[in-house]
Design a protein with these regions (language model features):
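...with weaker cross-activation on analogous glycine-rich loops/strands in unrelated enzymes
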Residues: 10-18, 47, 67-139
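Generic alpha-helix signal with a bias toward terminal, lower-confidence helices
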Residues: 36, 54, 65, 69, ...
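Active-site signature of cysteine proteases
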Residues: 128-162
Length: 162
């Protein structure tokens, strides 16, 4: 039987995912990182319209669930060592697959900028694929299916890392 802490963590994870699911379909007004709701995500992290907002969206979802962290608009900042449990090829290893939980944050590495440049929430994992909820994807919030080979890092902000 799961401990009280494990049950509370599971409930919180589902709350974050539920909040994110309600945002699916939110679109930018003009395709320039703008629009009423997009600007709300950005304001939550201290920015105004016109900035990339994938990290702001993730932070906003956590905030709506009552969590004070993460609250950062810069994607790489969501992956401190203490919270990150896989990087690079390690994310596809069998031991890591059992660690991935709903509301963990995934990061995609951008070769051109040589850092994580896109993030989102993990809804669940099916085989070697993550089902995700991401902001600033095709100018909107959407759910996607991503192969683990495309994932550079995974961080846990609810369970405190592993």
């Amino acid at each position: 039987m799961p401990s009280l802490q494990e049950r509370a963590e599971s409930t919180l994870r589902q709350e974050v995912i539920g909040i994110a699911l309600q945002e699916i379909g939110v679109r930018e007004a003009t395709g320039n990182n703008d629009g009423k709701r997009v600007e709300e995500y950005l304001r939550y992290t201290g920015l105004g319209k016109g900035y990339a907002w994938c990290s702001a969206f993730v932070s906003w979802c956590y905030g709506q669930a009552g969590l004070i962290e993460p609250r950062n608009p810069w994607s790489p900042a969501l992956f401190p060592n203490a919270r990150t449990y896989c990087r690079g090829d390690a994310c596809g290893r069998p031991i890591t697959l059992t660690q991935i939980k709903p509301a963990d944050i995934f990061g995609i590495y951008g070769q051109s900028v040589r850092r994580i440049n896109h993030v989102g929430l993990i809804k669940d994992i099916k085989g070697k694929y993550l089902r995700t909820i991401e902001g600033n994807s095709n100018n909107r919030v959407e759910s996607k299916r991503r192969h683990l080979s495309t994932i550079y890092a995974v961080a846990d902000w609810i369970g405190g890392g592993r």
